[in-house]
Amino acid sequence: MANQLILLKKDFFTDEQQAVTVADRYPQDVFAEHTHEFCELVMVWRGNGLHVLNERPYRITRGDLFYIRAEDKHSYTSVNDLVLQNIIYCPERLKLNVNWQAMIPGFQGAQWHPHWRLGSMGMNQARQVINQLEHESNGRDPLANEMAELLFGQLVMTLKRHRYATDDLPATSRETLLDKLITALANSLERPFALDAFCQQEQCSERVLRQQFRAQTGMTINQYLRQVRICHAQYLLQHSPLMISEISMQCGFEDSNYFSVVFTRETGMTPSQWRHLSNQSD
């Protein structure tokens, strides 16, 4: 694409030796589709927004983690108090003898799975390392770059230790109710979600959990689940031959007419229009 926005190294790194730095987004505003001359890790702390990565939409909120390669196209829209940090790095500048490919999905041809989640424990540990990394990356002493790279190595190992698939919180996890709830919602794309049954199983207050969820994400539980389902529907409309009625079932809508109403309200176009427009842009 001739007019593709490309973020340049010289606008983010202080010199050609610096391998890693941190870009805060407090908050992250709407940002047009772009690629980079560098790679990045995206860590979402709170709020919500629509993250479109290589034309696939993700409704993001606290705990979402993305591994972005230089060539990946992504954008942010529909943001609501979205707070995140980008840890940006140049693979060719890294000097530490670390098996980066084993730590970072997609690193220089490694198998790429871009979207993961961190629970509260992993987020707390990652935040501590990122704060130190940000301090060093802004430093001017002779060892600042080396210290920043050491901390980057610690960060990617911390993320690998604590990350989990969006719908698969480990059974042995000691994560919070909020982490368990978001995982349960990710597992409810095709079927109804019963919050009362979840709260009974976890022995918690439904009212308190609703309040906590809204405080951390900026959405109600139902709003979040609806947005996640619509994102999944957008992806299926673009990348699968399924009929719209089949897609509505796979996204938790038993009535395809109701699905069309909700989809149109959320995206501004009907499912058929979305599919047609997406096929035209391919």
Curated annotation (Swiss-Prot):
Presence of keyword Transmembrane: no
SUPFAM superfamilies per record: Homeodomain-like, RmlC-like cupins
Pfam families per record: AraC_binding, HTH_18
Record has NADP as a keyword: no
DNA-binding region(s), residue ranges: 196-217, 244-267
Domain (HTH araC/xylS-type): residue spans on this chain: 179-277
Places the protein is found: Cytoplasm
Main localization (coarse): cytoplasm
CDD domains given in the database record: cupin_RhaR_RhaS-like_N (cd06977)
Site (Interaction with sigma-70): 246
Cysteines joined through disulfide linkages: none
Classification via PROSITE patterns: HTH_ARAC_FAMILY_1 (PS00041), HTH_ARAC_FAMILY_2 (PS01124)
A Gene Ontology term for the protein's cellular component: cytoplasm
GO MF annotation, one: DNA-binding transcription factor activity
SMART domains according to UniProt: HTH_ARAC (SM00342)
Gene Ontology biological-process annotations: positive regulation of DNA-templated transcription; rhamnose metabolic process
Keywords for the protein's UniProt record, in alphabetical order: Activator, Cytoplasm, DNA-binding, Repeat, Rhamnose metabolism, Transcription, Transcription regulation
UniProt function note: Activates expression of the rhaSR operon in response to L-rhamnose.
Subunit annotation: Binds DNA as a dimer.
Full protein name: HTH-type transcriptional activator RhaR
Gene: rhaR
